[in-house]
């Protein structure tokens, strides 16, 4: 008997301590960009019992009341009562922010391509150099309507549903911290066949009974989110498997910006270059180039040029032009990967300034990405999720 082909991804809710930190960092970024679109921001946050520490490097003309932004973010998440172990009204906020290193700023503000021109006129999109070296990945698949792998798509939707039920008051005992995990079984052709296992752990009031939690999560969350045809009598459910989850959020664990990078992206289905997103402005290619790579991959798949596509980009600090672009369609392409690469070079400008212009990234749009994933979102409008390059790609490839 052959083994099942299983793949698992997880997600966490907005009340998870690492996600609290991400949301604070991105809320600060947005508040700065609202006043100063060209600010350089690298903002990190640590949260733990009763305390928030904000630190990093910021160069801006804006004035932002950091403590106020922190408290409003915590309030919006739902930590509004000391009973939950973390309260926006009483939490201590400590801020330690300095200006961006002049050595880094030199390469970002004037790319190597410009510095080598000896005062000659240059392409304005060569002006911004990459904020660091590194490699970034983008991925898309036709496995779901949002062009995301099924396991991470469902994992996000499960914790988002928990949050919606909590905020609406429909399930009054729910608290902000939660995690989900979905295991998908694939057939021999790599097509999603069924859901093998669902794990959900949700923080709850001390008065809630395990039987009540189990029934509500099964019926009001899992069965409301996962299509019935993917669930069967063999599907396994683990609901709060420790038996109790009253102590949660930053009271239960410390949280740090950038510690949920797989949740933020493709749930482990595609590689990750290692750089986190939250708290970083668009000159940081960890963030902007990852968005651009997703944009490229999604448009390729949406155009019907491949069933799945993976894009790798790499950069050198202070240099505008990518040091490499790699395309892999895993044998599903309707044209060769080399042809796709040539088309990408014609259709997409992948220099940092080109990405910023193409995706309009100098706006305060980042807070909405800091929970429930940066990709495949259908509840918010994100520029890198648009499929507006489909026709241009087809035209370049003669399709």
From Swiss-Prot:
- What residues bind L-methionine, as annotated? 57, 100, 253, 284
- Keyword Transferase: yes or no? yes
**GO BP term (any one):** S-adenosylmethionine biosynthetic process
Q: Where, in this chain's numbering, is ATP bound? A: 16, 177-179, 244-245, 253, 259-260, 276, 280
Q: Mind telling me which InterPro entries this protein's record contains?
A: ADOMET_SYNTHASE_CS, S-AdoMet_synt_C, S-AdoMet_synt_central, S-AdoMet_synt_N, S-AdoMet_synthetase, S-AdoMet_synthetase_sfam
Q: At the top level of its lineage, which domain of life is listed?
A: Bacteria
Q: Which parts of the sequence are annotated with region: Flexible loop?
A: 100-110
Q: What protein family does this chain belong to?
A: Belongs to the AdoMet synthase family.
Q: Please give the name of this protein.
A: S-adenosylmethionine synthase
Organism, by scientific name, is Lactococcus lactis subsp. lactis (strain IL1403)
Identify the gene encoding this protein.
Answer: metK
């Amino acid at each position: 008997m052959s083994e099942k082909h299983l793949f698992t991804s997880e997600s966490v809710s907005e009340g998870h301590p690492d996600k609290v930190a991400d949301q604070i960092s991105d809320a600060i970024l947005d508040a700065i960009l609202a006043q100063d679109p060209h600010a350089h921001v690298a903002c990190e946050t640590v949260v733990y019992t009763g305390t928030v520490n904000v630190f990093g490097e910021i160069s801006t003309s804006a004035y932002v009341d950091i403590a106020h932004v922190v408290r409003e973010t915590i309030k919006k998440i739902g930590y509004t009562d000391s009973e939950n172990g973390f309260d926006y009204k009483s939490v201590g906020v400590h801020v330690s922010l300095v200006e961006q290193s002049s050595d880094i700023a030199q390469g970002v503000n004037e790319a190597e391509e410009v510095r080598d021109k000896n005062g000659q006129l240059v392409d304005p999109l060569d002006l911004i150099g990459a904020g660091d070296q590194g490699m970034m990945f983008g991925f898309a698949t036709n496995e779901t309507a949002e062009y995301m792998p099924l396991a991470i798509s469902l994992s996000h939707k499960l914790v988002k549903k928990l949050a919606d039920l909590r905020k609406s008051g429909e399930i009054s005992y729910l608290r902000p911290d939660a995690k989900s995990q979905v295991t998908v079984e694939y057939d021999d052709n790599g097509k999603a066949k069924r859901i093998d296992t669902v794990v959900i752990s949700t923080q709850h009031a001390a008065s809630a009974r395990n039987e009540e939690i189990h029934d509500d999560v099964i019926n009001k969350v899992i069965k409301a989110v996962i299509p019935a045809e993917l669930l069967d009598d063999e599907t396994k459910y683990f609901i709060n498997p420790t038996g109790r989850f009253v102590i949660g959020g930053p009271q239960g664990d410390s949280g740090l910006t950038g510690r949920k990078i797989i949740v933020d992206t493709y749930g482990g289905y595609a590689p990750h270059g290692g750089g986190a997103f939250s708290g970083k402005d668009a000159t940081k290619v960890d963030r902007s180039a990852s968005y651009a790579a997703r944009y490229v991959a999604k448009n390729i798949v949406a155009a019907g040029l491949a069933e799945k596509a993976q894009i790798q980009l790499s950069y050198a600090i202070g240099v505008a032009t990518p040091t490499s672009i790699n395309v892999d369609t895993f044998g599903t392409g309707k044209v060769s990967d080399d042809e796709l690469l040539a088309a990408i070079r014609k259709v997409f400008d992948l220099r940092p300034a080109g990405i910023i212009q193409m995706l309009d990234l100098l706006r305060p749009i980042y807070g909405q990405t800091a929970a429930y994933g940066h990709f495949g979102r259908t509840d918010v409008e994100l520029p890198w999720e648009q499929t507006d390059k489909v026709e241009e790609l087809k035209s370049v490839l003669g399709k």
